[in-house]
Amino acid sequence: MAIQTSNLGYPRIGLQREWKKTLEAFWSNKIDEEQFLTTMKEIRLQHVKAQQEKGIELIPIGDFTYYDHVLDTAYMLGFIPSRFSEFTSYLDVYFAMARGSKDHVASEMTKWFNTNYHYIVPEYEEGLQISLKDNRPLRLYEEAKQELGIDGKPVILGPYTFLKLAKGYTQEQFATILKQLVAPYVQLLSELHAAGAQIIQVDEPIFASLTKEEVQQAKEIYEAIRKEVPNANLLLQTYFDSVEENYEEIITFPVSSIGLDFVHGKEGNLHAISKYGFPADKTLAVGCIDGRNIWRADLDEVLTLFTTLQKQVQTKDFIVQPSCSLLHTPIDKTEETHLSTELFDALAFANQKLEELVLIHSALTQGTESIHNELETYRNVHHTIRSSAARNREDVKAARTALKEEDFSRPLPFEKRYELQQVALKLPLLPTTTIGSFPQTTEVRQTRKEWRNGVISNEQYEQFIEKETEKWIRYQEEIGLDVLVHGEFERTDMVEYFGERLAGFSFTKNGWVQSYGSRCVKPPVIYGDVAFINGMTIKETVYAQSLTEKVVKGMLTGPVTILNWSFVRNDIPRKEVSYQIALALRHEIELLESSGIRVIQVDEPALREGMPLKEKDWDAYITWAVQSFLLATSSVANETQIHTHMCYSNFEDIVDAIRALDADVISIETSRSHGEFIDTLKHTTYEKGIGLGVYDIHSPRVPSKDEMYKIVEQSLKVCDPKYFWINPDCGLKTRRTEEVIPALEHMVQAAKDARSLLKTNA
């Protein structure tokens, strides 16, 4: 029996975010290309070496990237849109696709399955010459071999998932383009095999949600590849859910190993194995450590899983690995000594998860006695956190038990509410607003850092925040926006800010994970019962409202987004945690309303990303996600206008859910997806307030008035002008002031032009 340890992918960002800092230094011309490439190589090799030192045998090579692994694959295969043809160097093309430039719109960015990581969407164009433009996995494989003497495991994105994630082709073209991918994949795999790669990991996460016909189509591609590369040892890797529905077919694919997720797809994969077994001539790669959360594994449960598998499968060969890439977890917990002992002990970041894999390997190869002490430690840790007072609050349980049906709905239907709101708010046709945040300049960040370090007093910090707030209230008035925001200068992050003010949350010092590009986030840790403590946004919002006669929006992050953008306790259902957060936000919303705030925005940008991969599981998730939003927002008066905001989603999947939220106004990020949501609205109706984002805030370019007007014009063909709002795609926190002001001026002018046209045509 052969058992090996493996990792699917390692966090890219570096222990001190060296990767992020190097990228941003290069983008701002503080370092040249040579220094950039040298530093990135150092970081890349450090990561490979770190995994070897932890005892991992099959170390992933090629999971490292300068921006995004899907973008790497697109560039490698020649999926380069023609609008970037004037760029000649690799890095210029690569980063233009990722970020855009002054004259070039970036490729679309969207969520990687149901995670909080974003990938760059590959674009197919007619006449595209698909070929292996650059065998990057081979270069990195040889680099690790030559520099470190490590014979790694190349990791590539599989052809089927890659093309399914791409856009720009019709469904009728899919099969033809898929066949065109065979040749470059054959070349890629042949060259890796010839260079000595013992095993090559081919990621196909899309396999968790394919139809029978699609699986057969994928199998034909793998058969075509196998025919040309018969001796390459391929590990077909799935993750994020089970492949239960198509398991019987998938285990017949012409590959030597198959990787299954036994954390997020445990029940389905076990059921399939109990029914169909597992081939004796293949290796089973067992994803047994959660690659998406930060809690210590239950080693007893994992060992029981292996006992079950060994009884049910024909193979004697196993790989012990995480459920998915560790990209989604922070690197190491050793710096988190400020946390309580019970919480610190319960955590396992990427490096600790690698140690867990080695422990499991020892137990499987040498017997459980070999890790007796570690097993006892793990059992004690789990008992301590389960029995913690923070996880057993009677007041939280009582509030949940007391909920009634009427707590989940507004008193009047939308049409009647909106009439009352129009009278109260006196807004013009096509009102303009922003999504919430304004630029967090170096001065803002530095002042916050000084306050947190005790260099300046609370009073000095509050005065600074008030000064910034007033400055941006005046900017908004001068620009001519209709509904203003206070700018969120006191907030580091839209989830962290609320977590710091609610019971049940804790925060890491260095628990960073990559969100998109160089943007890293430090998700809160929901370890206990969530409860309201004191007002969280009242002071800043009321102050902003006191500065202007115009309406100022209260700004909150919704319960489902707080849930989906946090590391969440795994001892109770996510639905219950979401309801706890909703009850706390309900209290805050009531306080805002009683303080005179008449428009309150509750952002849910992450509602779509939390959806399960399988359509059969959608309804259950959407039901409690919508109920959570309604629980938070339904206690306000009819005259109070509830807004929400969403971004980066396949909205056609959730139009009904958006409607069910019963928000008076929803703003949706649409500009970067090149009008897809507008197309969705051609085939359905949305009869509530809606704002379709008119410019992409993730790019530094300032769009013209005409660009924005064109989006407004297209939107008004499918949206009722009476209910239509004009806004940017997202918050403006990451942009510079000199980018934001002209862009908003253009947006307001586009709104005025649209109003004039509507009046002329009336």
From Swiss-Prot:
Binds 1 zinc ion per subunit. Pfam families: Meth_synt_1, Meth_synt_2. InterPro entries: Cbl-indep_Met_Synth_N, Cobalamin-indep_Met_synthase, Met_Synth_C/arc, UROD/MetE-like_sf. The active site is at 698 (proton donor). Keywords: Amino-acid biosynthesis, Metal-binding, Methionine biosynthesis, Methyltransferase, Repeat, Transferase, Zinc. The keyword Cytoplasm does not apply. Its EC number is 2.1.1.14. L-methionine binds at residues 435-437, 488, 603. Pathway: Amino-acid biosynthesis; L-methionine biosynthesis via de novo pathway; L-methionine from L-homocysteine (MetE route): step 1/1. L-homocysteine binds at residues 435-437, 488, 603. GO terms for molecular function: 5-methyltetrahydropteroyltriglutamate-homocysteine S-methyltransferase activity; zinc ion binding. 5-methyltetrahydropteroyltri-L-glutamate binds at residues 17-20, 111, 519-520, 565, 609. Catalyzes the transfer of a methyl group from 5-methyltetrahydrofolate to homocysteine resulting in methionine formation. This is 5-methyltetrahydropteroyltriglutamate--homocysteine methyltransferase. It comes from Bacillus cereus (strain ATCC 10987 / NRS 248). The gene is metE.
